[in-house]
Design a protein with these regions (language model features):
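Glycine-rich phosphate-binding loops of nucleotide-dependent enzymes
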Residues: 1-231
Length: 231
């Protein structure tokens, strides 16, 4: 599905990504863990074309490095940034409809699915998105991206700053997404969530991957957790 090889990226003269390799297969949830500032968010931005990438990025066998972000989206890559990119003045339903218009007009994920999974969005479908709680806005952002029918969705820190109940709902949503046949590349800070829902995990440090394995592999590797994850 997604194959990234020797990915480099810069902010000015700062060398942020220093040879990142990662793979996401069909129907997989793959999480990227690591401390703040190691390049996890930049990895997603480089794949999406928001940061100029150097290296090889293949999506479904096609090179996408150097394409514009809207071109990459049209090929089937969805992206949910960390800042909960909603249209606050529009209603919940209008936000979801924008996702439909931007997508490929298929039925793998519908507005009805969003409302069924998150009844609070149904209850507040006529409310301005800007008045939703942080957890509700995150749910809306993910659901709106799904309306474009991506084959792969990249999600940056979806549980950041959310209450425990909202975190659980987001975890349930991610599992449901994968069950629908959509691959997920997840940047996540909460180790317990990543271990629970991921098929594979990467740990990132100093702009490169320092671990690639299964949840059981990471649980067994105390040195990686101590060196690269624990504060």
């Amino acid at each position: 599905m997604l194959d990234v090889r020797n990915l480099h990226a810069y902010y000015g003269k700062s060398h942020i990504l220093q040879g990142v390799d990662l793979v996401v297969r069909e129907r997989e949830i793959v999480s990227v863990l690591g401390r703040n500032g190691v390049g996890r968010s930049t990895t997603l931005k480089a794949i999406m074309g928001d940061v100029p990438p150097q290296g090889e990025i293949m999506f479904k066998g096609r090179p996408i490095a150097g394409l514009k972000s809207y071109e990459i989206a049209r090929l089937g890559v969805g992206y949910v940034p960390e800042n909960r990119d909603i249209f606050g003045a529009l209603t919940v339903e209008q936000n979801l409809l924008l996702g439909v218009k931007a997508g490929r007009n298929t039925t793998r994920w519908s507005i009805t699915d969003s409302y069924r999974l998150f009844p609070v969005l149904d209850e507040r479908r006529a409310a301005a998105a800007g008045v939703l709680s942080g957890g509700e806005q995150q749910m809306l952002t993910i659901c709106r991206t799904l309306m474009g029918d991506p084959d792969l969705i990249m999600i940056d820190e979806p549980t950041e700053g959310l209450a425990p109940q909202a975190v659980e709902r987001i975890a349930e949503l991610l599992l449901t997404i994968a069950q629908r046949g959509i691959s997920i590349l997840l940047v996540e800070q909460k180790l317990i969530i990543a271990l629970r829902i991921s098929h594979r995990l990467y740990v990132m440090g100093h702009g490169r991957m320092v671990f690639d394995g299964s949840p059981s592999d990471l649980r067994a590797d105390r040195s990686i957790r101590q060196s690269w994850l624990e504060v």
